[in-house]
Regions:
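Catalytic or ion-coupling anion/metal-binding cores of large enzyme and transporter domains
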Residues: 2-57, 64-85, 90-91, 96-101, ...
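Glycine-rich, highly charged phosphate/nucleotide-binding loops
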Residues: 101-110
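A short, small-residue-rich loop immediately preceding and capping a beta-strand
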Residues: 116-137, 149-152
Length: 567
């Protein structure tokens, strides 16, 4: 890239860091780690990596980072790589460690922001893999508003067990099946060994793949990049081009807040609805919208989902995995279907310099693919996201509906004040058909950290109760969850929400058509119970968890921390 194509030096933040006599100490330290005078004359591009060797989702990101850096150099820039944290949802699931997961989203965003501000980088490429690294990196890019993009590491390949494809979802459900005597321990051990064959994020339309798709639809990842699997050799080429692309963004001065508009956010929500994506996307897109300073409310998800057909037949509730979607045509095919359904704001801009409509029209569909349905033959006429309100959820809660769940369910409450207590009851087979399992004090403040209930929900499914019980919680659900499950109930129990007042045996009704979640108690009875209710003692009194509990907002606002921008 020639000098004439670059922004004026005065517009590059890095010039303040490395130019002039008084910056000799800074240059000396940069030279100590291998940078040359020639390197420092070029734009400095931060490569924000979330590599970690504790999980497959991010284990290959060092390799991809090298290709990104090569692309930056080819485009005329100097890449500077740094790392931030990551917490594995899948590994920590069902333990106290899971409380760190959602908290890590805020730390990832904060840490990237601090490194980039502290070193005056001119642009950023963020590499993500697991669930919270995707929204965390995007939140940081929007705060910084430098020419930048996010590159997703890609999905894991499906495992193979007894002639059928499997994912980590099957292992979680195998635990429940084993406890119910429906699977032997030997078979579970074999499944454990075969479910995860290598690097990459969990292989269904779970949270990571849902959010990677959403970021492509937002326009902050190059169209076609996210669905390339982690082990596909083409992924290295994608990474190289991402490095080149950030230099083109710098040349055009195209920044994230010009890309992440209201239209772009609605495109992302529509894609989640059309693919039966993770309910975690509600939390994360609300948080992303806040960083972009774009109005987005929880009820917008329901409004968009009502008008969007469910088109993708994907796990956890369907047949196909993420690599199947790649072979069918990738995220571009989803965009194309939404364009055909008139559910796409086609003029929204993307990092490629093309509109999302242009990208949708360029998408190629593999002949005879069976992953993404034609618009005229949807799996169901409305999307997979449903927002309920009612006496138990005045500020809303989130349900994923994919056509297999009952539209109405009424049953007696079985109340548990922690995930562990609920899991023990299920494993000991103390839950009966028709019960409504209530797991509370697991919200953003109460947990703190709003744990995912996959261990609980998978145990329910594994024991054959997936269609005969319901569950509601102020915690979250994994993207691998399926069945009638209401999460993100707000206000949460720890804040005095109605969920805190429920007792064993209270009749709870889910009415999906009416968008209601109610408990059969009079206002007078709820008031009497509220008078006797006392908030529980904080589970953490110092450290990051206590700090998070103090500052985090409601799930209905994205469970974000920090001062609202309008304050």
């Amino acid at each position: 890239m020639g000098d004439k194509a670059m922004p004026r030096a005065a517009r590059l933040p890095s010039r303040t860091l490395v130019e002039g006599m008084d910056r000799a100490p800074a240059r000396a330290m940069l030279k100590a780690v291998g940078f040359t005078d020639a390197d420092l004359k070029r734009p400095l591009i931060g490569v924000a990596n979330t590599w970690i060797e504790v999980m497959p989702c991010n284990a290959h990101l060092r390799r991809l980072a090298e290709r990104v850096k090569a692309g930056v150099r080819a485009g005329g820039g100097t890449p500077i790589e740094f790392n931030t944290i990551a917490v594995s949802d899948g590994i920590s699931m069902g333990t106290e460690g899971m409380k760190a997961s959602l908290v890590s989203r805020e730390v990832i965003a904060d840490s990237i922001e601090l490194v980039v501000r502290g070193h005056l980088f001119d642009g950023v490429v963020a590499l993500s893999g697991c669930d919270k690294t995707i929204p965390g990196t995007v939140m940081a890019l929007l705060r910084l508003d430098l020419p930048s993009l996010m590159l997703y590491g890609g999905s894991i390949d499906a495992g193979a067990f007894r002639g059928r494809p499997v994912t980590i979802q099957d292992v979680f459900e195998g635990v429940g099946a084993c406890a119910a005597g429906r699977m032997s321990r030997r078979d579970l051990a074999e499944l454990e060994d075969r479910a995860c064959p290598g690097p990459g994020a969990c292989g269904g339309q779970f949270t990571a793949n849902t959010m990677a798709m959403a970021v492509e639809m937002l326009g902050l990842s190059p169209m076609g990049s996210a669905s390339v699997p982690a082990t596909d050799p083409f992924k290295d080429d994608v990474a190289f081009e991402a490095g080149r692309l950030v230099m083109a963004l710098l040349r055009r001065n195209l920044r994230p807040r010009r890309i992440v508009t209201r239209d772009a956010l609605e495109n992302a929500v529509a894609a989640v609805a059309a693919t039966g994506g993770s309910t975690n996307s509600v939390l994360h897109l609300l948080a992303i919208a806040r960083e972009a300073e774009v109005p987005l409310a929880i009820d917008d998800f329901d409004r968009i989902s009502r008008k969007t057909p469910l088109l993708a037949d994907m796990k956890p509730w369907g047949r196909c995995v993420a690599t199947d979607l790649y072979r069918a045509g990738g995220v571009g095919l989803i965009a194309r279907r939404l364009l055909q359904a008139r559910r796409l704001h086609a003029r929204a801009m993307t990092v490629t310099g093309r509109t999302i409509g242009d990208e949708a029209r360029r998408a190629r569909e593999t002949p005879h693919q069976a992953v993404v349905r034609p618009v005229a033959k949807p799996l169901q006429p409305t999307g997979g996201l449903v927002i309920l309100h009612g006496t138990l959820a005045p500020d809303g809660c989130v349900v994923k509906m994919t056509g297999h769940e009952p539209m109405r369910f009424r049953g007696p409450a079985r109340v548990f004040d922690s995930e562990e207590a609920a899991f023990r009851a299920i494993q000991r087979r103390r839950i009966a058909r028709g019960d409504v399992i209530v797991v509370r004090y697991e919200g953003p403040r109460g947990g703190p950290g709003m744990r995912e209930m996959l261990a609980v929900t998978a145990a329910i499914v594994g024991q054959g109760l997936g269609q005969s019980v319901a569950l509601l919680t102020d915690g979250r659900f994994s993207g691998a969850t399926h069945g009638l499950m209401a999460g993100h109930v707000a206000p949460e129990a720890a804040s005095g929400g109605p969920l805190a007042l429920v007792r064993d045996g209270d009749a709870i009704t889910f009415d999906i058509k009416a968008r209601r979640l109610d408990v059969a108690l009079s206002r007078a009875e709820l008031a009497r119970r509220r008078e006797r209710w006392r908030p529980p003692r904080p589970r953490y009194t110092h450290g990051v968890m206590a700090k998070y509990a103090r500052f985090v907002s409601s799930a209905s606002e994205g469970a974000v921390t920090g001062t609202p921008r309008h304050a």
